[in-house]
């Protein structure tokens, strides 16, 4: 009897200790997301129950965009977020404790170039003024586009411009074109007579835009098994999106307060993936060299930088076929 009581007492002490230290048993993964189509799978994974089915207590918190959500990840108040290298590379170079665990959104149909009626070919941009958001994926696409089409960038006036000002500036003639992302691209020709989309970044394989799933490193270390299960849940979600696009769009649209038809339209050009491939890392290294060249961050050894940033172990543990690292 005394032995049985001792066993029960010991078990109770163990349970209290687990609760008191916030152990894995009561951990909930919190994803910071922007209110836009690239983040739709996180909403669907939670609301449709894919996270729960994989044994992952999870929630999402919405921000205006991925950038402020990422800042919360760096601060340690959220577990994970999703941004491009133009945000996470400078942060990591400045000491942010973050780990890249998977590529997530890939598209060649988000970044685009809009030009005025006077621009008939890429070379016509020489001697003209072009707007973009500097030090972002949009500016990187611009330089890759110029390189592809033999445009001498030294002959182009590049103006840093707020996205909300692009169409008005094009209308007034303050700029002759702009490179940007999202709805700013297709909407401009609707309000600026003669304007047109001259190219998207994926045309001629100029630049394929990527966003990756970034975890706070301390959270990853403390919840490695949960992180692996969450990757499986996201893979389940992506399969559902492909098989049931209407229902998927309705779920995401409700959270983002968008009509299902509009949500579906915005999700359509996006390729959601859970993978880590060496080819993608090599492309990331190329853009990292450009980021360093723009100034503001110093990365003496880019290969070492990326080997320390990427952690393929959670994906290897649950879906080894999704990574060749």
Language-model features: where?
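Conserved C-terminal helix/tail region of periplasmic/extracytoplasmic solute-binding proteins
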Residues: 292-325
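Sec/Tat signal peptide C-region and signal peptidase I cleavage site
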Residues: 18-24
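Short, glycine-/small- and polar/acidic-enriched structural segments
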Residues: 25-152, 157-162, 176-182, 197-201, ...
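Bacterial N-terminal signal peptides that target proteins for export
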Residues: 1-9
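Pocket-lining segment of extracytoplasmic ligand-binding domains
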Residues: 86-87, 159, 164-254
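Secondary-structure end/capping motifs
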Residues: 221-298
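Solvent-exposed, polar/charged alpha-helical surfaces in well-ordered, non-transmembrane soluble domains
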Residues: 40, 44, 48-49, 71-75, ...
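Bacterial N-terminal signal peptides
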Residues: 9-17
């Amino acid at each position: 009897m005394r032995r049985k009581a001792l066993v029960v007492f010991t078990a109770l002490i163990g349970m209290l200790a687990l609760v008191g230290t916030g152990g894995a048993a009561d951990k909930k993964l919190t994803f910071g997301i922007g209110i836009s189509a690239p983040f739709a799978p996180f909403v669907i994974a939670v609301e449709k129950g894919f996270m729960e089915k994989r044994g992952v207590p999870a929630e999402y918190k919405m921000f205006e965009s991925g950038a402020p959500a990422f800042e919360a990840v760096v601060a340690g108040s959220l577990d994970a977020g999703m941004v491009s290298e133009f945000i996470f590379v400078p942060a990591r170079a400045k000491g942010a404790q973050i780990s890249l665990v998977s590529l997530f959104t890939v598209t060649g149909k988000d970044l685009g170039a809009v030009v005025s009626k006077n621009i008939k070919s890429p070379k016509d941009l020489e001697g003209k003024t072009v707007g973009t958001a500097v030090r972002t994926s949009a500016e990187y696409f611009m330089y890759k586009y110029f390189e592809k089409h033999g445009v001498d960038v030294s002959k182009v006036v590049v103006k840093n411009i707020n996205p909300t000002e692009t169409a008005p500036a094009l209308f007034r003639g303050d700029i002759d074109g702009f490179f940007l992302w999202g709805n700013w691209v297709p909407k401009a020709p609707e309000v600026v007579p003669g304007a047109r989309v001259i190219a998207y970044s994926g045309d001629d394989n100029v630049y394929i835009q990527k966003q990756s799933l970034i975890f706070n490193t301390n959270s990853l270390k403390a919840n490695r098994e949960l992180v692996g299960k969450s990757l499986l849940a996201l893979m389940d979600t992506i399969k559902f999106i492909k098989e049931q696009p209407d229902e998927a769009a309705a779920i995401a649209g409700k959270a983002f307060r968008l009509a299902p038809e509009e949500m579906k339209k915005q999700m359509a050009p996006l390729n959601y993936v859970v993978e880590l491939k060496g080819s993608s890392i090599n492309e990331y290294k190329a853009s990292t060299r450009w980021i360093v060249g723009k100034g503001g961050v110093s990365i003496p050894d880019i290969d070492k930088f990326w080997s320390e940033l990427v952690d393929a172990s959670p994906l290897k543990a649950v879906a080894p076929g999704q990574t060749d690292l």
